[in-house]
């Protein structure tokens, strides 16, 4: 009976360590995915912002030079 308890305790301990390592790996993977999403959002937003800024500069130049 004592040997069985030792074996079960050892299995429980090893399983707990294994689960904690998996959790750390999962957290690292989720962090990488969040970084990738931020880069994707930046890639989509930057051209839009650049286009709006260019158009505003044209309007400002047109109003300042009064050539429109």
UniProtKB/Swiss-Prot annotation:
Its main location: secreted. GO terms for biological process: defense response to Gram-negative bacterium; defense response to Gram-positive bacterium. Residues 23-42 form a propeptide. Keywords: Amphibian defense peptide, Antimicrobial, Cleavage on pair of basic residues, Disulfide bond, Secreted, Signal. Belongs to the frog skin active peptide (FSAP) family. Brevinin subfamily. This is Lividin-1. It is found in: Secreted. It holds the Pfam family Antimicrobial_1. Expressed by the skin glands. InterPro entries: Antimicrobial_frog_1, Frog_antimicrobial_propeptide. Antimicrobial peptide. The lineage of its organism: Eukaryota, Metazoa, Chordata, Craniata, Vertebrata. Disulfide bonds join 62-68. GO terms for cellular component: extracellular region.
